[in-house]
C-alpha cells in the first residue's frame, strides 16, 4: 500500500513538470498522511486543460449515503479498481495524478513489533506521478467533498524486500491518456498500471520520526 508520501518539489517545478498553473500555496510536505488535503492533477471535462487541485486523501464514493468517519479508501488495487463498486465509476471517468517527491513503506524487522521506514524516490531529483482516482460526494447539506485514492500494484525488485505493494508510478508518456475523461478502453488503461522498473528508482532508510503522522518536517526524511 501507500500510506504516506513526500512532496517537497518547488511549486514552479511542479507547474512546469505537470503543465499546470503554478500553485500559490504549495508548501513543502515531508509526511503527507491519509485524511489530509493532497495536491492532484486532473482534467475535469473533455477537452479541458489540466488543473492542480486539493482533494482529501481517502476516497468517498459518490453514492455513499453518509461521509465515513474513518479514512479507509486511501488505496485501490490496480487489478480490481475497474470492477469494485467503490472505484469503478471513478476508474471510468475520474482519473488523476498525485505528484510526489517520494513515498514511504515500512519493513517489518526480525523479532516482530518494530518496523523500519524506507523512502523511495526516482533516481535524480525530479517529481513523479502516482496514478489516482477522484470522486465528488454531495452531502444532504453543505458543500460537496472531493476526495481521492492512490492506485497500487505489485512491487518491483527494489520495493519487494520492504513491502508487498507499491503505488503505480506513471511515466509521463501515459499522463495524457490517463487524465483524458474520454479514455474509456479498460484494457488500455489497465496496461498502464504496472510497476515502474526498479532501475529508475532509489531507496534509503529514514528516521522513525516519520512514524507519527503529526510530524511534518525535514526530520521525517533524515537518516536513522
Protein language model features and the residues they cover:
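Short linear sequence motif anchored by a di-proline
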Residues: 1-224
